[in-house]
Amino acid sequence: MEVKIFNTQDVQDFLRVASGLEQEGGNPRVKQIIHRVLSDLYKAIEDLNITSDEYWAGVAYLNQLGANQEAGLLSPGLGFDHYLDMRMDAEDAALGIENATPRTIEGPLYVAGAPESVGYARMDDGSDPNGHTLILHGTIFDADGKPLPNAKVEIWHANTKGFYSHFDPTGEQQAFNMRRSIITDENGQYRVRTILPAGYGCPPEGPTQQLLNQLGRHGNRPAHIHYFVSADGHRKLTTQINVAGDPYTYDDFAYATREGLVVDAVEHTDPEAIKANDVEGPFAEMVFDLKLTRLVDGVDNQVVDRPRLAV
Ligand code: MBD
Ligand code: FE
């Protein structure tokens, strides 16, 4: 049987009570958001005739999601992270701000406190038996298009199993493996030696993948490398590059791939190049320049503050 009660005064009054709108104390913004979200959910229960069994399955699911620390993983999977980027892009467009280097999502696996060095860093500890050497470098440009010395380039990525240090279920990786902060040199350049990452897959038995299965979706990301770039007078840029040619490049479960962020990994086998790059054998090279945008009225109007792991 289907009943309609959502629009009754009783239910509407109840939503205000449950959201604390009839209380003096508390936080008005939280009340406003909770009132709206509760209202939308109550309405969905009515419109879709969501059963008690379905509702309680949802409650159990949220508990599982938290117990597995996967809320930050389901979030990009459901497109929230990309949607927030779309909104920031639209705000920038409205302000006439051009992002020569597109932003894309941070993801849930950044860790603050990586080792810092000037100009160059070796990122991998050499322990990945399948690691193929990657030389990744480029120039950071300021908002006027000039090379920018002393910019901070934070880079993090996965190993050849798609696992990140600090989040590796095998426990194989040392702290901060494949996580570095490089300060650009006097020419605005950064350079790292690391290994080509593999794509990421959601934990196959976890609650995120469980829901994706119900949606008929996979939980894979293409091979990618994360960046934060920050510098005086500029907005912090959050982005990623994809290694070109990955089968998931244009089928990312987290919707982070964007035009301008797909970069070829060029294979070098000639002895000259191997010697010039001070590596032991054949290696891949990726070149990626990033251009920052200036502060808006002296502030970073889009910097994202979120709980992050700091070690
Ligand atoms: C990742 O490495 C990632 O970048 C995102 C967005 C989600 C899961 C794993
Ligand atoms: Fe990632």
From Swiss-Prot:
It catalyses: catechol + O2 = cis,cis-muconate + 2 H(+). GO terms for biological process: beta-ketoadipate pathway; catechol-containing compound catabolic process. Fe cation binds at Y164, Y200, H224, H226. Gene3D superfamilies: Aromatic compound dioxygenase. Its EC number is 1.13.11.1. GO terms for molecular function: catechol 1,2-dioxygenase activity; ferric iron binding. InterPro entries: Catechol_dOase_N (IPR007535), Cchol_dOase_prob (IPR012801), Intradiol_dOase_C (IPR000627), Intradiol_dOase_core (IPR015889), Intradiol_RC_Dioxygenase (IPR050770). Pfam families: Dioxygenase_C (PF00775), Dioxygenase_N (PF04444). Keywords: Aromatic hydrocarbons catabolism, Dioxygenase, Iron, Metal-binding, Oxidoreductase. Catechol binds at Y164, H224, I225, H226. Contains a helical zipper domain, consisting of five N-terminal helices from each subunit, which forms the molecular dimer axis. Belongs to the intradiol ring-cleavage dioxygenase family. NCBIfam families: catechol_proteo. This is Catechol 1,2-dioxygenase.
